[in-house]
């Protein structure tokens, strides 16, 4: 199928200095948890996107010196020849597919905690990081400035040696160049502080030095936070931003534009809960107005129509993407081939980002279960090993895990029967996507629905059976399938069982008229009173989402939370605006409080720290702490129990108890996946469905086969002349 001619503009080549982008699709620098220490992961993840048609692939932020060490998080590094060797694996693989490779040179100032190197970071002035804990920098004198600028030059030369085509001076997200430019950080009174011209001096000099060193071989880019979105007192696009672009335009070959700062970089990597694609256009277009160089901006671009609007209206020249490239590494190729309904659209949940925020474990993706698994498991997002046997597979449950398993199995040539009691695939995601701001999460369901519909046309023996009665163990055993996958999901606890006490709460019972589970709130069938209390022991989105839904509908909402409310939303960058939203709606929170018992219309709550700080051994059967005297009663008209989830695995348990009957019914194996195995993130539920489907022919698909680990082996020196002998300097 040919692409629509109006999209031809997206495939025009773009010249950036001495290099040429083959089209306008550009993967901006983004973290994956590979850095320089996992070259297989780094090269495989970036190169599969090069295969998918992206014009350029960048590393994550890449440290130029041990003074810029982001441990506990995992960045790339280009400190020495060992890093050059490891990163060259990426550039070599990317070049095989005709794409350019870029590196983002990073010096963090006080935002680099240096937990591994224990070096002292330097900055324009001495300040404490608002992002890191107990991290201060040394104010740079003139010799410090010259030395750090040389760090950039040396790193740029190593980058060229590693095969990189594009070299960034990273000045977004409150890192060193922007710290000099921003009066929020820069309190200097010498030639590097005060006026805009002085505050810009460090950045301009650094660009000039890097360009002189490698500019004939590499395109020079800078990532610029054109507006910190705090208003006066920091960087504003039409006050300082545009003027700086005019100052630096001759020194760069391409502008990569962001907004926001390090403390709230979710203003740039906007979650779909709060921001639609293209949300940064009002700022990016201001740069395009004054620059003579190619300009790119990000905005979770997934729709080709939005992409051509950006180019034809002159907002930007290049479509910058991070999250959309993770969700679908073959997005450019699918647009080029006119396969628009095959695009795996990023849902904007920011679970990919959460892994970096947590500290750098391998990146995952809710939409694309192969993300991060390209090297270690050998998974390709568009290629599947074709089965040589004729096994049929019954999948009970068409939620995120079951529908993903069905898709992968059908792609691999199996006959699949996917069944569910609901009228639509998606499982609990159908309710979740109806919560405020989460509509785009339904793209997860839509992609699988579209692909399964297509695959059913190819394999006439496969079936999708929705709106069915619940299957019993007898139904499964007598169905006639060779293999069975149970994907019956999870539900919220009706009795208040929670992570704090691991027991039900006396009086908790969602069958009562004044108590509800989240599912009951979302399905809207049960009457909800004016005064609502949400009892929370969940650390993700459910309690604040229900609070927003109910408060918007006119209810008076109080959240009683025994855990840090919405803690995981810190990692997905949703937390600041979620808290602002609850404040706007006058939602009250009683943090560090939980419930001891419930009676009609009221609940007894207590401060979880109310048992005192002193501990004394008092013998068996007696608490070593004092009695908690903080108990008090609060009233409600309706109580929502957001205390925990449990797997709906009754069918699995019944089948497992009758395992001796499997063989006599010609069943080779029955497997449990997704939330039915254990409640988890949608991304992880999707992954388990994908994994079991990929490994369905293994001896026991329930247990994952070992993946390739990238480790430093004893006796393999990382640096030239290095060794792994234990030697003490005495």
Curated annotation (Swiss-Prot):
Which GO terms of the molecular function aspect are on file? 4 iron, 4 sulfur cluster binding; FMN binding; metal ion binding; trimethylamine dehydrogenase activity
Q: Which organism is it from?
A: Methylophilus methylotrophus
Binding residue positions for FMN: 29, 31, 61, 104, 223, 268, 300, 322-323
Q: Which SUPFAM superfamilies match?
A: FAD/NAD(P)-binding domain, FMN-linked oxidoreductases, Nucleotide-binding domain
Q: Supply the alphabetized keyword list.
A: 4Fe-4S, Flavoprotein, FMN, Iron, Iron-sulfur, Metal-binding, Oxidoreductase
EC identifiers of the protein: 1.5.8.2
Give the matching Gene3D superfamilies.
Aldolase class I (3.20.20.70), FAD/NAD(P)-binding domain (3.50.50.60), NAD(P)-binding Rossmann-like Domain (3.40.50.720)
Q: How is the cofactor bound?
A: Binds 1 FMN covalently per subunit.
Q: Name one GO biological process term.
A: catabolic process
- Summarize where substrate binds, as residue positions: 170-173
Q: Which InterPro entries does this chain map to?
A: Aldolase_TIM, FAD/NAD-bd_sf, NADH:flavin_oxidoreductase, OxRdtase_FMN_N, TMADH/DMDH/HD_second_a-b, TMADH/DMDH_FMN-bd
Please state which protein family the record places this protein in: In the N-terminal section; belongs to the NADH:flavin oxidoreductase/NADH oxidase family.
Positions annotated to bind [4Fe-4S] cluster = 346, 349, 352, 365
**Which interval of the chain is the signal sequence?**
none
Query: Which residues act catalytically here?
Result: 175
Q: Which reaction does it catalyse?
A: trimethylamine + oxidized [electron-transfer flavoprotein] + H2O + H(+) = dimethylamine + reduced [electron-transfer flavoprotein] + formaldehyde
The protein's assembly and partners: Homodimer. Forms a ternary complex with the heterodimeric electron transfer flavoprotein.
Question: Which co-factor is required?
Answer: FMN; [4Fe-4S] cluster
What name goes with this protein?
A: Trimethylamine dehydrogenase
**Pfam family membership, one:** NAD_binding_8
Q: Give the binding site residues for ADP.
A: 401, 420-421, 428, 471, 675
Q: Which residues carry this modification: S-6-FMN cysteine?
A: 31
Which EC class, in a word?
oxidoreductase
């Amino acid at each position: 199928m040919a692409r629509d001619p109006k999209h031809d503009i997206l495939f025009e080549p773009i010249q950036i200095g001495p290099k040429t982008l083959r089209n306008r699709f550009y993967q901006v620098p983004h973290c994956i948890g590979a850095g320089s220490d996992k070259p297989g992961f780094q090269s495989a993840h970036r190169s599969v996107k090069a295969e998918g048609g992206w014009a350029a692939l960048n590393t994550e932020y890449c440290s130029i010196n041990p003074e810029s060490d982001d441990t506990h998080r995992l960045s790339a590094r280009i400190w020495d020849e060992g890093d050059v060797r490891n990163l060259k694996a990426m550039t070599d693989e990317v070049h095989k597919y005709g794409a350019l490779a870029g590196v983002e040179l990073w010096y963090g100032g006080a935002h680099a905690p240096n937990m591994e190197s224990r070096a002292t970071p330097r900055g324009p002035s001495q300040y404490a990081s608002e992002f890191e804990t107990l991290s201060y920098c040394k104010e740079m004198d003139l010799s410090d400035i010259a030395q750090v600028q040389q760090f950039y030059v040396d790193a740029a030369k190593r980058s060229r040696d590693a095969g990189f085509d594009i070299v960034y001076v990273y000045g977004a997200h409150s890192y060193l160049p922007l710290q000099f430019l921003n009066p929020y950080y820069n309190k200097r009174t010498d030639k590097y502080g005060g006026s805009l011209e002085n505050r810009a001096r460090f950045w301009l000099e650094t660009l000039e030095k890097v360009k002189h060193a490698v500019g004939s071989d590499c395109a020079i880019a800078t990532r610029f936070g054109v507006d910190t979105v705090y208003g006066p007192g920091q960087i504003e696009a039409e006050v300082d931003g545009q003027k700086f672009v005019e100052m630096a335009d001759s020194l760069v070959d391409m502008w990569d534009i962001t907004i926001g700062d390090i403390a709230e970089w979710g203003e740039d990597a906007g979650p779909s809960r709060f921001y639609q694609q293209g949300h940064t256009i009002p700022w990016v277009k201001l740069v395009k107005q004054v620059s003579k160089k190619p300009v790119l901006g990000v905005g979770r671009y997934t729709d080709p129509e939005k992409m051509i609007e950006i180019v034809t209206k002159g907002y930007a020249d290049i479509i910058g993407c991070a999250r959309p490239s993770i969700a679908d590494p073959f997005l450019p190729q699918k647009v080029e081939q006119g396969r628009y309904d095959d695009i795996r659209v990023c849902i904007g949940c920011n679970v990919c980002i959460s892994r970096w925020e947590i500290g750098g474990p391998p990146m995952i993706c809710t939409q694309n279960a192969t993300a991060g698994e390209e090297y270690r498991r050998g998974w390709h997002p568009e290629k599947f090993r074709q089965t040589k046997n004729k096994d049929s597979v019954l999948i009970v449950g068409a939620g995120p895990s079951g529908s993903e398993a069905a898709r992968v199995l059908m792609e691999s040539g199996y006959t699949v029967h996917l069944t569910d009691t609901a009228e639509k695939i998606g499982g609990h995601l159908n309710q979740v996507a109806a919560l405020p701001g989460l509509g785009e999460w339904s793209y997860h369901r839509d992609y699988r629905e579209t692909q399964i519909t297509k695959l059913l046309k190819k394999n006439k023996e496969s079936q999708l059976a929705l709106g069915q009665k619940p299957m019993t163990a007898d139904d499964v055993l007598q169905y006639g399938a060779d293999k069975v996958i149970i994907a019956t999901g999870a539900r919220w606890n009706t009795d208040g069982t929670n992570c704090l006490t691991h027991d039900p709460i006396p009086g908790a019972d969602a069958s009562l008229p004044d108590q509800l589970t989240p599912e009951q709130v979302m399905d809207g069938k049960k009457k909800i009173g004016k005064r609502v209390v949400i009892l929370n022991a969940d650390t993700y989105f459910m309690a604040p989402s229900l609070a927003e839904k109910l408060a918007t509908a006119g209810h008076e909402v109080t959240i009683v939370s025994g855990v840090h409310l919405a803690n995981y939303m810190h990692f997905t960058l949703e937390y600041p605006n979620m808290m602002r939203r609850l404040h706007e709606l006058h939602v009250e929170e009683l943090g560090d409080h939980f419930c001891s018992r419930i009676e009609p219309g009221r609940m007894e709550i207590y401060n979880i720290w109310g048992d005192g700080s002193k501990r004394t051994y008092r013998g068996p059967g007696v608490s070593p702490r004092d009695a908690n005297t903080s108990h008090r009663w609060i009233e409600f008209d309706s109580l929502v129990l957001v205390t925990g989830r449990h797997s709906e695995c009754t069918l699995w348990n019944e089948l497992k108890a009758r395992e001796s009957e499997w063989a006599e019914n010609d069943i080779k194996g029955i497997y449990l996946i997704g939330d039915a195995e254990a409640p988890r993130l949608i991304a992880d539920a999707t992954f388990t469905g994908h994994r079991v489907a990929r490994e369905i022919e293994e001896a026991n698909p329930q247990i994952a086969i070992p993946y390739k680990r990238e480790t430093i082996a004893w006796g393999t020196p990382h640096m030239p002349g290095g060794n792994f002998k234990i030697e003490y300097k005495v």
